[in-house]
Amino acid sequence: MGFLDKLFNKTDINIAVEQFRATPGAFLIDVRTGPEYEAGHIEGAINVPLNSIHFIVNHVRDITAPVYVYCQSGARSGQAVSMIREMGYKNVTNVGGVNRFKGKLVR
């Protein structure tokens, strides 16, 4: 994890995906646009675009559930995490950008 990741409170996306997969009841949220999501996303991720982030309540009803949020580079996920926390969610993590994910993407 680099200095900027620490500065912007981001967790390494590869570690976070492992944590997501190992945690029952956790959610992985992709806040990119629909076309970006369809072009390639992490298996198990739910697409809730940043401009529709308020719809997260349709997917994550438990405000204490672990929620991992990513985008393309980490900027939109940072914005989304702030917005989700403002909605009352307690356990939300910015995991940065899918551009740093080393695993295979679902297309």
Place the predicted regions along the sequence by residue.
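N-terminal glycine-rich beta->alpha transition that marks the start or flank
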Residues: 30
